[in-house]
């Protein structure tokens, strides 16, 4: 009876958390919808008097708005990619691992299993990275997200504003979303500013439009400042081929810690996110190379790394491991043992 009550309570709490997790997204959507109304109707159709200026403003605005909304949608609804089945422990191995009471034997079991996989990163103490929640050996750059309750390939962070985990499958879309958000705010601020001055001087009569135009400039500038900082930080991460987690805690390889272990050079680092074909760089479609399980590494020479030597990868078995301190709990990453 008590167990059933606890299960019902736990299920109710999970349901409430899932519902509440959409609140930040709803806030963003409402702000964007209001900005659309304020710009299109109150500014362009009511305040702007020149027909040519109206047309130019509306065309440019909608071009930016489409890409802004498209990338936001892709960031939200592109599911995080999880490690494939070859990284999961079989039922027999799982039971053997769970029933083994000696830590040193458990560690050796993971070492033996990892020998079949292209795993080059380790925990802080040099052990194979293993997720005891998902029961798998983690691919390189893969981490467990406590919010999504899953291991995510090339996890960067969990973002409440898109209610999704940002990783290999959607990092390109997230970066594009930041870029188009900055452009969206900048465009609104620059085109609204002259009318803000006119309202401030009392040269325009409409009281209702005055409120929307003034507040629109304030909101656009506020979001622009915060977004340009975040976008600049992620541009720096891309230029170094790092994730947010790797920027906070240096990856540990079999040879030891190496903060530039995945740094291939500026151009190749960009291609690791956007792909080789530049015509897809500005469009939110999947073009990141690889399958998210293994990545070219600077710390390995071409004879050791099949991704740099253009050889066949290890039968789709690609994985990563690493430890992170408690200070990163706000990034929704479970500690690894």
Swiss-Prot record:
GO terms for biological process: establishment of protein localization; peptidyl-L-cysteine S-palmitoylation; positive regulation of dendrite development; protein localization to membrane; protein localization to postsynapse; protein targeting to Golgi apparatus; protein targeting to membrane; regulation of dendritic spine morphogenesis. Its main location: Golgi. The keyword NADP does not apply. It catalyses: L-cysteinyl-[protein] + hexadecanoyl-CoA = S-hexadecanoyl-L-cysteinyl-[protein] + CoA; L-cysteinyl-[protein] + tetradecanoyl-CoA = S-tetradecanoyl-L-cysteinyl-[protein] + CoA; L-cysteinyl-[protein] + octadecanoyl-CoA = S-octadecanoyl-L-cysteinyl-[protein] + CoA. It is a multi-pass membrane protein. Zn(2+) 2 binds at residues 145, 148, 158, 165. Keywords: Acyltransferase, Golgi apparatus, Lipoprotein, Membrane, Metal-binding, Palmitate, Synapse, Transferase, Transmembrane, Transmembrane helix, Zinc. In brain, expressed in both excitatory and inhibitory neurons but not expressed by glial cells. The chain crosses the membrane at residues 21-41, 57-77, 173-193, 211-234. Autopalmitoylated (in vitro). Palmitoyltransferase that catalyzes the addition of palmitate onto various protein substrates. Has no stringent fatty acid selectivity and in addition to palmitate can also transfer onto target proteins myristate from tetradecanoyl-CoA and stearate from octadecanoyl-CoA. Palmitoylates IGF2R and SORT1, promoting their partitioning to an endosomal membrane subdomain where they can interact with the retromer cargo-selective complex. This is Palmitoyltransferase ZDHHC15. It comes from Rattus norvegicus (Rat). The gene is Zdhhc15.
